[in-house]
Design a protein with these regions (language model features):
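Ligand-binding cleft/hinge of the Venus flytrap
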Residues: 46-58, 71-79, 152-159, 166-195, ...
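Extracytoplasmic small-molecule ligand-binding "clamshell" domains
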Residues: 26-108, 116, 193
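C-terminal motif of bacterial Sec signal peptides marking the signal peptidase cleavage site
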Residues: 17-20
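A ligand-binding cleft/hinge motif common to bilobed small-molecule-binding domains
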Residues: 90-97, 107-117, 173-182, 202-247
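Periplasmic-binding protein-like
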Residues: 37-38, 125-133, 216, 226-270, ...
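Bacterial signal peptide processing site
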Residues: 22-24
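Ligand-binding clefts/hinges and TM-proximal coupling segments of bilobed small-molecule sensing domains
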Residues: 145-147, 151-189, 264-294
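Acidic, polar ligand-binding/catalytic clefts
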Residues: 76, 81-157, 236-246
Length: 294
């Protein structure tokens, strides 16, 4: 069953699954998907077409990533055509509510604040929290996968340092909630958020910021781009994140309020995709993202 689904996703690349959008608004007959195309390993832009990519609407470029793998799976399972629209992060929800797209498949977390504007599918991936750091700044024995750092250890390590993240994502909120506003009188600063994760990673690489929090697949993708200088700093995040923030480590598909038909279709389709298959698709996306450069 698993092999058939994954082979079907790969085979789908040989089919023409794209169509033009109706300027008067989208319908559920076509999956019109909004994403940044700049959020590795969930989605990014490439000039090369491959079995893993889909063309970006009204562009000569292509989108790759975990979100594209999920889009291909949904297209095959629901037997619907797909359009990929490249949008800035801050434009995703407004575009959904303006009927310019009918789905946000962009590594977006289902939060109470976003729920005020849109609905969400069931999660299509749940991740761990980790940090991106320069190898030269942190002892190699600290924050390993086998021995993740505790909250107190993180506070001590980050004392006097600056943290950075992409704007409008849960990791950026975590910086203030758990580190800048810590109760142990540690002085931890919040660097201005960057527009994308690669730009935030550049801050870490250039020494402007000390560390960047994000979902583990994102951190792994950033380290793959510069294995000589960057590494993953693992932490025992379950020991300090609230239950709501733990939920924030999962990503879901954004759907316009009232579009119950599409929401039910997406949830039924996602339920067929096992955790093992999702992990395999993400591992492939993370590996491919290393072909890009910071």
């Amino acid at each position: 069953m698993k092999k058939k689904i994954l082979l079907g996703i790969i085979a789908l690349s040989g089919l023409s699954m794209m169509t033009a959008c109706n300027n008067s608004g989208v319908t559920n007959d076509v999956l019109v998907i909004g994403m940044e195309c700049n959020y590795q390993p969930f989605n990014w832009t490439t000039s090369k077409s491959s079995e893993h990519t889909l063309p970006i609407d009204k562009d000569n470029q292509f989108a790759d990533g975990y979100d594209i793998a999920i889009a291909k799976y949904l297209s095959q399972d629901l037997k619907k055509e797909v359009v990929i629209k490249r949008l800035e992060w801050g434009s995703l929800i407004p575009s959904l509510n303006a009927n310019e797209i009918n789905m946000i498949l962009a590594g977006m977390t289902d939060t109470p604040e976003r729920r005020e504007s849109i609905n969400f599918s069931d999660p299509y991936l749940t991740s761990d929290l980790a940090f991106l750091v320069k190898k030269s700044n942190v002892d190699e024995t600290l924050g390993t996968k086998e021995n993740p750092m505790s909250y107190d250890e993180l506070l001590n390590l980050f004392d006097g340092k600056t943290l950075v993240c992409q704007a409008n994502v849960v990791g950026d909120d975590f910086i203030n909630t758990y580190f800048v506003n810590n109760k142990q009188n540690k002085t931890i600063r919040h660097s201005p958020a960057q527009a994308t994760y690669p730009l935030a990673a550049n801050d870490v690489l250039g020494g402007i910021s000390f560390a960047m929090p994000a979902e583990l697949p994102v951190i792994e993708a950033m380290t793959n781009l510069n294995k000589n200088e960057l590494r993953v700093l693992y932490c025992d995040y379950k020991g300090f994140l609230s239950s709501d923030d733990l939920n924030g480590l999962s990503v879901s598909i954004g759907i316009k309020k009232g579009n119950t038909e599409l929401e039910e279709e997406l949830n039924a389709s996602l339920a067929k995709l096992s955790a093992e298959e999702r992990s395999s698709l993400m591992a492939g996306a993370a590996t491919r993202s290393s072909e890009s450069a910071l």
